[in-house]
């Protein structure tokens, strides 16, 4: 979709989902507009559900998940918002997501999945290509990214 404001055309991407398990519930975000003195509010996934959906994808798809953005998102969101993650909510969101997707059986084998992902030369090659395309990821080693994902999983599994 493209938007036009004052003759400037800007591409706009939206991500609309239905039927997902938002756990424990959606949250309202307020965004201050840059060109007007007001804010808009939207309902969106809570942080734990965003993380759970990406984490479940890594666990269930292992090396068939070639979308490096998922790996980057898991790393950067844990770095930027790690202190605000509620472990019980992350655990509940991960279980709800896996149940909705029919992948609950894979959760117990997550540590092995992370090992496989990290050791796979093709995955690391895809990561290097992602780094070249997106400079914000240039200084992040594949090991660092996968270790962040392991840490999130451990947080979700903490009792």
Residue ranges and their predicted role:
Residues 1-159:
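Structured mid-to-C-terminal alpha-helical surface segments
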């Amino acid at each position: 979709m493209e938007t036009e404001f004052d003759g400037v055309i800007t591409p706009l991407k939206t991500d609309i989902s239905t039927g997902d398990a938002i756990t424990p519930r959606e949250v309202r975000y307020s965004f201050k507009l840059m060109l007007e003195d007001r804010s808009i509010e939207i309902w969106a996934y809570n942080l734990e559900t965003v993380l759970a959906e990406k984490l479940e994808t890594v666990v269930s798809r292992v090396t068939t998940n070639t979308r490096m953005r998922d790996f980057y998102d898991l790393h950067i969101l844990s770095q930027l918002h790690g202190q605000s993650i509620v472990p019980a909510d992350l655990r509940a969101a991960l279980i709800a997501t896996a149940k909705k997707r029919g992948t609950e059986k894979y959760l117990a084998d997550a540590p092995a999945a992370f090992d496989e992902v990290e050791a796979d030369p093709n995955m690391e090659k895809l990561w290097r290509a992602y780094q070249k395309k997106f400079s914000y990821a240039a200084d992040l080693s594949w090991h660092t990214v996968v270790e962040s994902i392991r840490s999130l999983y451990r947080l979700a599994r903490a009792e």
